[in-house]
Amino acid sequence: MKFSSGILSLAVAASVQSVQASYHAHGHAHHHRVLNKRADPDVVTIPGPKVYAFILNGSEMSKEQVCAGIRDGRLDWSGQNHDELCGFPVGMQKGSPPACPAPSYVPSPPAAPSSPPAAPQPPSKSPETPEEPKKPEEPKKPEGPKKPEGPKTPSPKKPDGPQHPQTPTGGEGVNRPFPDGEIDCGDFPSKYGAVPVDYLGLGGYTGIQHTTLVGEVFGTIRTAIAGESCTDGAMCSYACPPGYQKSQWPEQQGSTGESVGGLACRNGKLYLTNRKLSTRLCISGVGGVHIKSTISVEISICRTDYPGTESETVPVPLPPHGHLPLTCPQAETYYFWQGKSTSAQYYVNPPGYGPAKACQWGHAGLPIGNWAPVNIGVGEKGGVKWLSMFPNRPTTTAILHMTIEIVGEGLSGKCKHKDGKYYTDTGVNEDGCTVSVLHGEATFVFSYD
């Protein structure tokens, strides 16, 4: 696991106001990078007119690039509120984009999630209120019955194998207390709410980290590969049913900022690592957030296994015309990374790929897995839910050719993705969008509209 950082400096007139941004990278050599958590800024006020220059690692950046990076979690701001520069206050988490506290998205070099997102302001760009792209006229169909709308995505029209290949099932006993120290490490605890993800080849676990505790931190962390199992000294992470999330991770974390999560295997038995949070393996989110499909093929949505390996291995398979809860963590009670609250991040894959292909590490040739085109951030902080969508850059420039819109009666504004562009109340851009849920519930609706 590696940890890299960058420093973003802001020059003001003849004096300098210090601003910091960092990329917290962690994972395997082929891991993607995850967004950073935000720190409270530290700004010195200087009277007189201000001229701003943004410097990251010696290279100048535009205001738009900086604000977009702060909003989607790729950059950290060290200073006071940046309202006057970007139009929104300091946000909440790593991995959480402009408004939602979700762990961040990741590029090829892996990274770590961040704290809750910033305010529900639209992205920095405010172009000339461009119109949404008009739906192209349907090409004339050959004689014969009309076929239902087909995916306009770069993915194959027909997935390999069955329509729902190895879709994880389970969740039995989700409210059953876990019998600490009684279950063999090799027996996946599916009777206690955990959902086995067998296609990863890890005995049902979503990730296994072999750790060595040095004082109060894990000095070395080795991530298991397919074919390995949960053995003594390992932390063994797991998935939960839609609407639920894992409750177990140790207080100790990696010496260079890596996250570690799951049950501990000691003397051949599984032990809870976070009893003060829960003695159940899976706990519910705050509720009130859903995903809904209006199309006739499966869509694989994958949550980052965080804290843990931080790979997108927690499947949320949305069936054709399906409707499921999307887990929304509460910032004040869920995982904290280096003292900062975190939220959930999800990867949206093109329709037609089952979780066995989409919810694991991929490669640049296909827009799935860590190369999926779109990320979703979800989290609640201070009683307000923050929901966002943003492109999985710089990992990929792939475009998701479908529509995702956040709908609900109590939203702070508009947030809609269509064919790689994001629409807000003030216009359209390519950097993402965020809304808060002022009251009621909200749903991410997937369609070919």
Swiss-Prot record:
Region (Disordered): 96-185
Feature: compositional bias, Pro residues: 98-125
Family: Belongs to the SUN family.
Transmembrane helix as UniProt keyword: no
Protein name: Probable secreted beta-glucosidase ARB_04747
One example GO MF annotation: hydrolase activity, acting on glycosyl bonds
Residues annotated as signal peptide: 1-21
Biological process per Gene Ontology, one example term: fungal-type cell wall organization
